[in-house]
A protein has these predicted regions:
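...the same signal can extend to comparable exposed beta-sheet modules
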Residues: 11-15, 24, 35-39, 46-50, ...
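Glycine-rich, acidic and aromatic/proline-enriched surface loops and short helix-turn segments
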Residues: 1-6, 22-28, 55
Length: 382
């Protein structure tokens, strides 16, 4: 606050209640944006400090018209005018936000830094691009008005957005993995039971209040195995190649990273946006091993006593494999970052044998029927 021009003595940042005044001021100008658990009177984490510093770049600076002290005999009178925003009449006006003729912190101290609204990221989410002079630092998605990671009813979106009127389906735009696709879930109205999204798919919802339109952005999670992990060279960064055969999903490809090893099972996202068409993110899939007791046609499996619903992109593969699993053997289920099943690794091989001899009455205590088997590896078993 001091760096933005706020005077601690004038604003009451002293005395027993200084923290209350500081917190109130910080919240009032948006320094806590992005932290729903802001306290203000406790030590901050590294991530929180970075967030507050970023928000300060966008904050408007302030100043005071006058601060005079008048002494008449034994009486001291302090006169202070009201606080006002610092004006900006330089060519940096508009580098941060609109041309509002107000001085944002970054406009004063980082004149080569600029933000550009109205862009979109690899998945077509409304985004802001930051540049240093002409060099692009990065494009970052704006905060969504609602977010889901499972299939959701349209009526629930209506309620979560706090809408008072419905939105026609013609005013809803749907992108899936960066590709514009047809929205077919009907008008966004109260109580609608039609659904969008999917289990294990990130669905970001953006509401344009001025235009009364919705943009839905679905980012699917796929699964693959690391087929090769290449070290960095003088001409290329380290990267991995994905194997998406077998029961894996998605288009696969390569991804620049040195975080994974050959045969790791990973989850990843992929963009089909023109100019992108590549893997956008990747993470090591969590795994759980145990006996699979049940499965459903929707692809959910119960392993080691816990039920895991299937990721929408993996449901069919998991169901088809689950029908062939030997229930007496352990399986390993791999999960996405939301806890949905992506892939099940199980021994589904079939052992063949020739019956050499069969006795209906073995002559033991229980008169058990027995057979002598010859397996393909030459071993025999009774």
């Amino acid at each position: 606050l001091g760096a933005l021009g706020y005077d601690s003595s004038i604003e009451g940042y002293t005395g027993a209640n200084w923290t209350v005044n500081v917190i109130k001021q910080a919240v009032g100008i948006g320094l806590d944006d992005g932290n729903d658990n802001f306290v203000g009177s406790q030590a901050v984490t590294r991530e929180e400090a970075a967030l507050y510093a970023f928000n300060m770049l966008n904050a408007t600076m302030v100043e005071y018209d006058q601060q005079n002290t008048i002494v008449v005999g034994d009486i001291t009178i302090n006169t202070t005018s009201s606080r006002k925003d610092v004006s900006n009449t330089t060519d940096t006006d508009g580098n941060i936000g609109s041309r509002d003729r107000k001085m944002q912190f970054a406009e004063r101290y980082f004149g080569d830094l600029s933000e550009h609204d109205g862009d979109s990221d690899a998945f077509e989410r409304p985004s802001t691009t930051w540049k240093l002079k002409s060099k692009t630092i990065g494009t970052y998605a704006d905060e969504a008005d609602a977010t889901y990671t499972s299939e959701v009813k349209v009526g629930e979106i209506y309620s979560d957005l706090g809408l008072s009127d419905g939105i026609s389906k013609q005013d809803v735009t749907l992108y899936e993995d960066g590709f514009k696709t047809t929205y077919s879930a009907g008008d966004v109205v109260r109580g609608s039971r039609q659904k969008v999204g999917g289990d294990g798919a990130l669905l970001d919802v953006y509401y344009d209040e001025d235009a009364d339109t919705l943009t839905l952005v679905q980012v699917n999670t796929y699964v693959g195995k690391i087929a090769a992990a290449r070290k960095a060279t003088s001409t290329r960064d380290a990267y991995v190649t994905l194997d998406v055969s077998d029961s894996f999903t998605g288009p696969g490809g390569t991804y620049d990273t040195d975080d994974f090893s050959k045969d790791d099972i990973v989850y990843y996202t992929y963009s089909y946006k023109t100019g992108e068409k590549c893997v956008e993110s990747m993470g090591l899939a969590e795994k759980v091993t145990g006996t699979m007791s049940t499965y459903t046609t929707e692809g959910s499996v119960t392993v080691a006593g816990t039920k895991y619903n299937a990721n929408v992109k993996s449901a069919n593969n998991i169901y088809n494999l689950a029908t062939t699993v030997d229930r007496s053997k352990d399986v390993t289920v791999y999960l996405d970052s939301y806890g949905y099943a992506l892939y099940v690794d199980a021994d589904t091989s079939v052992e063949y044998a020739v019956v050499l001899n069969y006795t209906a009455n073995a002559g033991d205590f229980n008169n058990t029927a027995k057979a002598e088997l010859l397996f393909t590896d030459g071993t025999r078993k009774t």
